[in-house]
């Protein structure tokens, strides 16, 4: 028995531990860049995005680039709640180049992958998976990007698994989006990334 336990300890000590990094400190927007006039602020430890005076697109991008990673976060949509999580993205003004994992109202393909200013929808979840979304409640999203493969989960439900050469060549930050049109408010918390 002692030999078995010692063997397990030896194995565990040789496996490199990959640290999870918080993207949001719960205090301020340190480590993030705001793009556009939409509102991004901290309220009682939560990250909030809200339509601003121009009712346009807005983005909040990490200062750091992430290539291969596993990201988990929680979001709560209020009103329309159309938003998204961009991966390997760059933002110039309010024009983003990259891929969005959709965060949207029921029936609008949350968890699907959309390429902005490019090919449009690359993959949408099967319609029956829409029931995983809890509108007006806290939802947990997980996004895993390795090489040319992207996967998403919503509240532990696998939403998509997709391979795309162009995504595999992408470089950039993780960014949150608020859609244009006005009247949108989304709260975010527990944004944790594990670089792979």
Where in this protein do the model-derived segments appear?
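Sec/Tat signal peptide C-region and signal peptidase I cleavage site
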Residues: 15-19
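Carbohydrate-interacting regions of secretory-pathway proteins
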Residues: 20-196
